[in-house]
């Protein structure tokens, strides 16, 4: 289901370049931005199991960010995925951590998580997400949606 775009939402596709360490061709990085979020939405998935992955959003112009939203869904297996968010205001030379969050998934319990993190960030040139697919075993990194707000 497409989430309506808020007036203060940053159009990541129009204002940034996204790089990533890997993607499953059936679940490409573009799925993060396609507005089909929520349970059952499209998703980005790593092409490599048991590998820590990175997604870097490089903005065309420095951005002010007041909120970071992302979603994760796992319906098939038990796993604990960790997401770390870091920002740079110097063109990607140095980053500072703004968020570390773990999500515990179980097919018979929690299968969907949405994070809405309020922040007060200025002149952001890069946002880097590091995804640990499973802190306690095997798994593949994935994210369902990524939204940023000015």
Locate the predicted segments by residue.
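Trp- and acidic/polar-enriched beta-sheet ligand-binding modules for extracellular glycan
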Residues: 10, 21-25, 48-52, 74-150
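Short loop/turn positions at the edges of beta-strands in beta-sheet-rich folds
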Residues: 59-62, 121-123
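Short edge beta-strand/loop segments characteristic of extracellular beta-sandwich folds
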Residues: 69-71
């Amino acid at each position: 289901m497409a989430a309506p775009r808020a007036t203060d939402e940053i159009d990541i596709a129009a204002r940034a370049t996204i790089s990533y360490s890997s993607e499953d061709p059936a679940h490409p990085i573009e799925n993060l931005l396609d507005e089909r979020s929520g349970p059952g939405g499209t998703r980005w998935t790593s092409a490599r199991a048991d590998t820590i992955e990175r997604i870097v959003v490089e903005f065309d112009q420095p951005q002010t960010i007041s909120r970071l939203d992302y979603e994760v869904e796992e319906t098939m297996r038990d796993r604990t995925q960790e997401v770390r968010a870091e920002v740079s205001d110097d063109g990607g030379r140095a980053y500072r951590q703004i968020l570390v969050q773990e999500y515990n998934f179980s097919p018979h319990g929690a299968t969907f998580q949405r994070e809405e993190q309020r922040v007060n960030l200025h002149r952001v040139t890069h946002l880097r997400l590091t995804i640990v697919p499973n802190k306690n075993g095997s798994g593949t990194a994935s994210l369902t949606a990524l939204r940023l707000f000015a």
